[in-house]
C-alpha cells in the first residue's frame, strides 16, 4: 500500500520507484539502474498477464525514456550523486551514464518487444548494444568503465576492478540475451531483429543470417519478418522495396525453404539534438548506421581545442 507511506529520503519514494504502485507510474524516475530493471519486470509481467493498466504504464515509461531521457550513445542516468534519471531533456554531455544502466535499458527493451512486437524497440536496444556496451570494455577485455560520459577532458580511464563491481556481470548478462534478441518467433512468424551474423533453430526450423542473406529450411510454412532499422536507407528485400510492412518489419512469405537477400544503405548521418537539450545547442554528432562516432584529439591546452564542421 503506497498511500500515506512515510518517506525515508533520499532512498525511498521516486528514488526507489516506490512512490506509487507500478501500474500508476508513467515516467522514468529515480536510480537509473534500479529503474530500468524494475521497468523490465513491469513489461515482463504485463506481457505474461496481459494486464492493460500495467501494459499502458510500461509503454508510457518506455516512451518517456526513448523520447526525452536517452543519450545519443544509448545510455541513461544523469546525476553522479544518486545515479538517477534527470528531468525530460536534461541530457548534459558530462552525465553519469552508468554501464549497468545501459545494459538494463537493453533488457527493458527486450521485455518491451515481448509486450508490443514493435520493431522500433530495437532501434533503442541496437544503439545501446553498438555504443555504450562495447565502449565500456577495453580492447584487451580486462578493463571496464563504471560511467560513460560523452565528453571528457582527457582525465577519464577504464578500471581493472572497482569497489562496486556490478558492471562486468551485467555485461555478461546482456551477452547471454543476444540469441533471444537477434531472432524471435511468434506462431508462424520469425523475426530478424538485429542484423548480426548468426544461426538459429526453432524446432525443425533452421535459419541463418550471413553476408546480407537469410537462409531458411523448415517443415513449417514460415513468414519472415525483417526489421527495417530507423537509420536504414534504400531498404530492399530480394532487390525490391518491401511491399508489406507490419510494425516496422518487412514481411516475406518464405514458405518452407528460401534464401532472402536483404540490402540497406548506411549513410553517414549528421544529427542534432532536440532543441530543448540546452547542452547541445550549436553541436552535432555523426553516426553511420547504429554506430556513434567519437571525436578526439590530444592537446596541451584544452582552451585551444576549437574546430568547425
Tell me what each language-model feature is.
Residues 1-309:
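Glycan-recognition and catalytic cores of secretory/periplasmic carbohydrate-active enzymes
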Amino acid at each position: 500500500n503506497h498511500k500515506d507511506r512515510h518517506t525515508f529520503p533520499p532512498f525511498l519514494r521516486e528514488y526507489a520507484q516506490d512512490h506509487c504502485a507500478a501500474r500508476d507510474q508513467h515516467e522514468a524516475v529515480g536510480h537509473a539502474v534500479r529503474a530500468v530493471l524494475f521497468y523490465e519486470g513491469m513489461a515482463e509481467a504485463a506481457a505474461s498477464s496481459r494486464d492493460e493498466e500495467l501494459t499502458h504504464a510500461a509503454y508510457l515509461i518506455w516512451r518517456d525514456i526513448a523520447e526525452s531521457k536517452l543519450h545519443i550513445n544509448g545510455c541513461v542516468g544523469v546525476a553522479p550523486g544518486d545515479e538517477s534519471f534527470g528531468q525530460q531533456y536534461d541530457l548534459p554531455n558530462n552525465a553519469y551514464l552508468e554501464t549497468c544502466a545501459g545494459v538494463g535499458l537493453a533488457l527493458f527493451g527486450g521485455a518491451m518487444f515481448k509486450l508490443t512486437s514493435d520493431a522500433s524497440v530495437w532501434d533503442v536496444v541496437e544503439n545501446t548494444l553498438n555504443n555504450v556496451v562495447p565502449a565500456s570494455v577495453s580492447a584487451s577485455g580486462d578493463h571496464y568503465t563504471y560511467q560513460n560520459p560523452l565528453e571528457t577532458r582527457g582525465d577519464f580511464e577504464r578500471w581493472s576492478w572497482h569497489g562496486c563491481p556490478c558492471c562486468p556481470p551485467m555485461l555478461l548478462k546482456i551477452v547471454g540475451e543476444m540469441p533471444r534478441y537477434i531472432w524471435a518467433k511468434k506462431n508462424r512468424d520469425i523475426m530478424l531483429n538485429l542484423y548480426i551474423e548468426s544461426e538459429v533453430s526453432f524446432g525443425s526450423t533452421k535459419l541463418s543470417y550471413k553476408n546480407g542473406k537469410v537462409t531458411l529450411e523448415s517443415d513449417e510454412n514460415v513468414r519472415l519478418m525483417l526489421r527495417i532499422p530507423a537509420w536504414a536507407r534504400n531498404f530492399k528485400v530480394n532487390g525490391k522495396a518491401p511491399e508489406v510492412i507490419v510494425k516496422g518489419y518487412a514481411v516475406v512469405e518464405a514458405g518452407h525453404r528460401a534464401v532472402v537477400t536483404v540490402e540497406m544503405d548506411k549513410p553517414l548521418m549528421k544529427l542534432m539534438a532536440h532543441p530543448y537539450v540546452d547542452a547541445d545547442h550549436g553541436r552535432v554528432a555523426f553516426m553511420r548506421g547504429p554506430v556513434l562516432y567519437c571525436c578526439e584529439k590530444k592537446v596541451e591546452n584544452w582552451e585551444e581545442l576549437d574546430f568547425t564542421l
